[in-house]
Amino acid sequence: MKISYHGHSVVRIETNGKTILIDPFITGNTTTDLNAADVKADVILLTHGHGDHVGDTVEIAKRNNALVVATFELATYLSWQGVETFGMNIGGAREFDFGTVKFTQAFHSSGFVTEDKQIIYLGMPTGILFTAEGKTIYHAGDTGLFSDMKLIGERHSIDVAFLPIGDSFTMGPEDAAVAAEWLGAKLVVPIHYNTFPPIAQDPQQFVSLLPPGVGRALQPGESIEL
């Protein structure tokens, strides 16, 4: 399994002959190394409906005939735009040919702001547990610290956890360090920082809060192999 980070909250997983993208916010992402027009994907997983996470989903999904897996409301909304979707919800797991997807809770919000000043509710925000080849990846999405992260860590052996550290809209570094401890992940990678001024952070400072060897700040385009 190959896992790549592409700035903000964009993660790519290559496994079982498939390419899976999580939260493909590319156009307008000042930290990414990707060009949306060149991105290939078989599957897109979405944590919630904010624009900096849904991003280029519709364009990428249509061009690649990719399946989009998201919460029921978000999946329904995207299906109306001609995208193939599979709707799920928090606590539910589904085994696909590319791996198993399970949605966890997240403490945040989820909605799309339209140009005519309307907000479309798009279900609950989530985290994602993705399991394939005997490895489990946890992408927390956007969230504050919550005590059930302990339960997630108890119920699942997490190989890599992607945790937001930007503060303002999500956990900051200190709370994310507590989350890392509760989750017990073998490797913790910071996400959702430095894209916009309100979420400016030093990822190495976050890494320094973790036990030696647990934290690793990936550069956009950098990969790890499991």
Curated annotation (Swiss-Prot):
Entry keyword annotation includes Membrane: no
InterPro entries: Metallo-B-lactamas (IPR001279), RibonucZ/Hydroxyglut_hydro (IPR036866), UPF0173 (IPR022877), UPF0173_UPF0282_UlaG_hydrolase (IPR050114)
Keywords, ordered alphabetically: Hydrolase
GO molecular function, one term: hydrolase activity
Pfam family of the protein (one): Lactamase_B_3
Keyword field contains Hydrolase: yes
Stored NCBIfam families: PRK00685.1 (NF001911)
HAMAP family: UPF0173 (MF_00457)
Similarity comment text for this entry: Belongs to the UPF0173 family.
Protein name (database record): UPF0173 metal-dependent hydrolase GTNG_2675
